[in-house]
A protein has these predicted regions:
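Short amphipathic alpha-helical segments and helix-helix/interface helices
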Residues: 118, 146, 169-173, 213
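Catalytic beta/alpha-barrel core
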Residues: 104-111, 158-162
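Active-site-proximal helix-loop elements at catalytic-domain edges
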Residues: 142-160, 218-225
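Non-catalytic, well-ordered alpha-helical scaffold segments
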Residues: 46, 76-80, 115
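Short low-complexity, flexible loop/linker segments enriched in glycine and/or proline
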Residues: 143-146, 172-175, 198-202
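Active-site gating loops and adjacent loop-to-helix segments of metal-dependent hydrolytic enzymes
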Residues: 7-42, 61, 80-103, 198-223
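Conserved, well-ordered alpha-helix/loop/beta-strand core segments that scaffold catalytic motifs
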Residues: 107-137, 141-150
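A metal-dependent hydrolase metal-coordination microenvironment
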Residues: 1-74, 152, 157-194
Length: 225
């Protein structure tokens, strides 16, 4: 079973920490953590819509929310609404202009600490993974983060990812070996917000060996002994 805390923070950078093999008795704990994160995220999104309206970019937050599958609004939904209203020509343009924090409309929500989430997952007896490590960190920042994360219980880092090129994959593999971390992988499937990625199928020639899962599963079972 898998549960993820997709948005955590370290040194003001957004990191994605994934929890694997969450036990049923910990579902309520995870739900509580995620509910608080979602509350802060919604407050940020509502403020974003309010700030946009001040400069004439009028959006209906309730309408955006009702258009989502699960009732959770993210910036991709707001970007799509801006495009539908004709304020931008594409979702990409929205993210590169109005939705960037430097424009002043978007105020990032407070997020749980990455190290805190890793410690909680360790306390649950679950496996923690740093997903797509180069998304918001360069190599030096990653190397600064990993020793602290491993001390808190980090088990693995994603080495196989849809948007990694060959050099990034090889670097991620090397770093995993250097820090004694397991390798993980994923397509980064996010439903309708990433329509070009299917469940379990990434972009390009992404292929994740079954051995990757087996190593993670063995780590989980050994941890429980």
């Amino acid at each position: 079973r898998l549960c993820s805390s997709d948005l955590t923070e370290y040194n003001s950078k957004q990191l994605h920490i994934v929890g694997l093999f969450i036990k049923k008795e910990n579902y309520s704990d995870i739900t509580e953590i995620m509910a608080e994160s979602q509350k802060l995220k919604e407050e940020s999104n509502k403020l974003l819509v309010k700030n946009l309206a001040k400069d004439g970019y009028i959006l209906d937050y309730d309408e955006i929310k009702s258009s989502t599958v699960d009732g959770f609004v993210n910036r991709a939904n707001i970007a799509a609404a801006l495009m539908q209203k004709g304020y931008v020509s594409s979702v990409k343009e929205a993210f590169q202009t109005l939705l960037m924090s430097k424009f002043g409309y978007y105020v990032p929500p407070k997020r749980p600490s990455s190290l805190y989430i890793i410690e909680r997952l360790k306390g649950f007896g679950s496996i923690s993974v740093l997903a797509h490590p180069f998304l918001n960190m360069n190599e030096d920042e990653l190397r600064e983060f990993l020793p602290k994360a491993k001390a808190c219980g980090l088990n693995a880092t994603e080495a196989y990812y849809s948007l990694f090129d060959k050099a990034e994959t090889e670097l991620a593999e090397k770093i995993c070996d250097e820090y004694g971390l397991l390798k993980s992988g994923g397509s980064d499937f996010h439903g309708a917000t990433k329509p070009d990625i299917s469940l379990g199928v990434g972009k390009g020639n992404l292929a994740i060996p079954t051995e990757i899962y087996k190593n993670l599963a063995n780590c989980y079972h050994n941890f429980r002994l």
